[in-house]
Amino acid sequence: GFGSGKTEVSVNLTKYLAGIDPIPPAIVDLDLVNPYFRSREAEAEMEAMGIKVIVPRGGNFFADLPILLPEVKGAVESGAGRVILDVGGDSQGARALGSLSDVFPPDGYDMLMVLNSRRPFTGDLAGCCKVMSRIEATAKMRFTGLIANSHMIEETDPEVLWEGYHLAREVGREMNLPLAFLSAKREVLEQMDTTGLNCPILPLTRSMLKPWEKKTGPTGL
């Protein structure tokens, strides 16, 4: 994506968990800005893996939210498998998450901040801490960890990944949060010497193609 890349991370993490968890997870689209994950192709692919996909069905996110929230609450409260929420990092996303805050037991959830050091507002320690504190206040929930996901779309290289890793470590020390994992496109990770990288790695397979990137006709089959 054009922002932190959290939708790609959410989808790839959900697919990974579907392969290792005894009960496939559910994924919830609470991102108001990025509609790509609502595409029929992405939804069909995840459902074929046994993943429950919970998305707004109408054209207006805010009108759909009151209908969506009971379904999300039901998935969380059922205790049947993990539930991954893809939440926008803006004020609307934080408010949507805040409307669910009473569903999560205080120690029964992980809230992970996806950090991209190449984005405005999260390019340095002060910016990251400010953004995260604002989200926590609005969402009425606390972050429990960080994901290093620095990228520049197609221009990402190992240097960008290391930059993001070091920033995430710095933020983690300041806010007393662990680094859950580093995520990056598989082809960039293959170029990277990971010696000294002290965290798990989630390779990303890009699934959120923009409409203009999708091939059509016989050559795209």
Regions found by a protein language model. Name each.
Residues 91-198:
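Conserved catalytic-core segment of NTP-binding enzymes
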Residues 6:
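Conserved lysine of the Walker
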Residues 56-61, 80-96:
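Switch II (G3) loop of P-loop NTPases
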Residues 3:
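Walker A (P-loop) phosphate-binding loop of P-loop NTPases
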Residues 9, 13:
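Hydrophobic positions on the alpha1 helix immediately C-terminal to the Walker A/P-loop
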Residues 15-64, 71:
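N-terminal phosphate/diphosphate-binding loop that engages ATP/GTP or pyrophosphate donors
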Residues 192-221:
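N-terminal regions of ATP-driven nucleic-acid and macromolecular assemblies
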